[in-house]
Swiss-Prot record:
S-adenosyl-L-methionine binds at G123, R128, E145, P146, V147, L179, Q180, Q195. Belongs to the methyltransferase superfamily. NTM1 family. It is an enzyme of class 2 (transferase). This is Alpha N-terminal protein methyltransferase 1. It comes from the Eukaryota. It comes from Oryza sativa subsp. indica. Gene3D superfamilies: Vaccinia Virus protein VP39.
Length: 307
């Protein structure tokens, strides 16, 4: 059976398929994992929306889904407090948790080789994650963000960062494009970081995005998805048209994307009224089983996705 859930107005859905049919007029390839709906926590401390300033493809309800999300984020102040939904206090904790998750992954995947590391910050907002975290680890970071005043703020914030001597670790490119329309350059990125934004995409656009994004990974590159997690099923926020999925829901979507979980970690020390947050490191090849029964982590070999 499909995941059960509800929206922020109290409407219950027997499945994610039913919800997507109601919201965008089509079944959005919902995953199949039975679950019971939960009471809604406070609004998530997510950052920016991922629908585009440009209109999303498709017609009718799907366009309305994305345009409503963009309208919401266009009304949000381009500040840390704004993009974190009034929870600017979680910034330091968030950065610390992300750093602790990423450091060992970089060491394991890339070792001590002098490699020019490049990351993509998806749903980058004002450049909060890039400035406070990604630029510590990567020589270049590209930012993709659909809300123009957020991206303009990111350019200003990161220019200031460059002026204090961090020229060897720089924000390289700024793309004002929604994720559902974005395709990365082939083989450019060591890490594609996606945080507090994938909830803006219906399931079918979620799957399409990851399938396109695979071509952007270098050999041994990987995705990190950091997101709010519902205890069961899903919770749909009608204010900004975003969905909070359960861990089981995400895992079904990862399978549909042809992605494998390399590691998972919970974000700690968030305010109790917020959703839980998990970090997933995702790779494109299934870990092989060694003779001792342990899984060996192979290098990624990104392939061109053909239509």
């Amino acid at each position: 059976m499909d995941s059960r859930g509800f929206d922020s107005e109290g409407r219950e859905f027997s499945s994610a398929t039913e919800m997507w049919a109601h919201e965008i007029g089509a079944a959005a390839d919902a995953p199949v994992s039975a679950a019971v709906a939960e009471p809604a926590p406070a609004p998530a401390a997510g950052s920016n929306g991922v629908a585009g300033e440009q209109e999303a493809g498709g017609g009718g309800k799907r366009e309305e889904w994305y345009s409503k999300a963009i309208a919401y984020w266009q009304g949000v102040e381009a500040s840390t407090e704004g993009v974190l939904g009034g929870y600017g206090c979680v910034n330091d904790v968030d950065v610390k948790g992300s750093d602790a998750f990423l450091r060992p992954l970089l060491a394991e995947r890339f070792g001590a080789a002098r490699r020019h590391l490049v990351a993509l910050d998806c749903g980058s907002g004002i450049g909060r994650v890039t400035k406070n975290f990604l630029l510590r680890h990567f020589n270049e970071v590209d930012l993709v963000e659909p809300v123009s005043h957020f991206l303009e703020a990111a350019q200003e914030n990161l220019t200031e960062c460059m002026e204090v001597g961090e020229d060897t670790h720089k924000a390289a490119n700024f793309y004002c494009v929604p994720l559902q329309d974005f395709t990365p350059d082939e083989g450019r990125y060591d890490v594609i970081w996606i945080q507090w934004c994938i909830g803006q995409l219906p399931d079918d656009d979620f799957i399409s995005f990851f399938n396109r994004a695979k071509i952007g990974l270098k050999p041994n590159g990987f995705f990190v998805l950091k997101e709010n997690i519902a205890r069961n099923g899903f919770v749909l926020d009608k204010e900004d048209n975003s969905i909070t999925r359960s861990d089981a829901y995400f895992k079904e979507l990862f399978k549909k994307c042809g992605l494998y979980i390399h590691s998972i970690k919970d974000q700690s020390d968030l305010p109790k009224e917020l959703f839980a947050v998990k970090m997933y490191a995702l790779v494109t090849e299934k870990p092989k089983i060694q003779k001792n029964g342990k899984r060996r982590r192979p290098k990624n070999s990104p392939r061109m996705i053909r239509s």
